[in-house]
Amino acid sequence: MITDGIMHKVREVYQLLRKEPGIIVGVSNRHVHLSREDLETLFGEGYELTPVKELRQPGQYAAKETVTIVGPKGAIENVRVLGPVRKETQVEISRTDAFRLGVRPPVRDSGDLEGTPGIVIIGPNGILVKEKGVIIAKRHIHMHPKDAEYYGVKDKDIVKVIVESGDRRLIFDDVLIRVREDFALEFHVDTDEANAAMLNTGDLVYIVEF
């Protein structure tokens, strides 16, 4: 039987293993990234996204525009479009969303779309039938190269992250490190993962070494 005393000792060990400072959490709700061509199909020729909220990652923003995504079993309205436009359209949803839509997306890094299921996207000016592009985003940490040097990691490394706040302390395994010059330090999880750990955007988590 695991006693409170044992759990207290375990938490003390985790605190010794964790790397300071903590990393800010960004909880990612379902959203869509659109290519230029697909943006114009959905919203009209020459259309430009309207930024309404800057995201923590430099140059990225939530747009005013929303779409409806439709799968074999259902639809979800008011799905936010994130900007700027990308080379390829990508739809990021949670596993809960996937059940609602009737699709079975894999857990993938952003941009890794080969072999992913398609979906229908409806905008005010048109409808897209995408043959691929739906993923459940792999949990990851964005880092600037200076952050990666500080934490002793490199691009594509896999680490563990501990959640110490709230009543659902846990460790996220298999967390991908993504390093780029235009990234800011942030731990990204989807809404299912955040709910499991009772995490909110702005909370802090810690990389741990074993």
UniProtKB/Swiss-Prot annotation:
SUPFAM superfamilies: ADC-like (SSF50692). Signal peptide: none annotated. It is found in: Cytoplasm. One of its GO terms (biological process) is propanediol catabolic process. Pathway: Polyol metabolism; 1,2-propanediol degradation. CoA binds at V27, S28, N29, K73, R80, F99, N195. Keywords: Acyltransferase, Cytoplasm, Metal-binding, Transferase, Zinc. The keyword Ligase does not apply. It catalyses: propanoyl-CoA + phosphate = propanoyl phosphate + CoA. InterPro entries: Asp_de-COase-like_dom_sf, PTAC. Zn(2+) 1 binds at H31, H33, E92. It holds the Pfam family PTAC. Phosphate binds at R86. Zn(2+) 2 binds at H140, H142, H188. One of its GO terms (molecular function) is acyltransferase activity, transferring groups other than amino-acyl groups. Transmembrane segments: none annotated. Formed by 2 beta-barrels, each is capped on both ends by short alpha-helices. PANTHER family: PHOSPHATE PROPANOYLTRANSFERASE (PTHR39453:SF1). Belongs to the PduL family. Involved in 1,2-propanediol (1,2-PD) degradation by catalyzing the conversion of propanoyl-CoA to propanoyl-phosphate. This is Phosphate propanoyltransferase. It comes from Thermotoga maritima (strain ATCC 43589 / DSM 3109 / JCM 10099 / NBRC 100826 / MSB8). The gene is pduL.
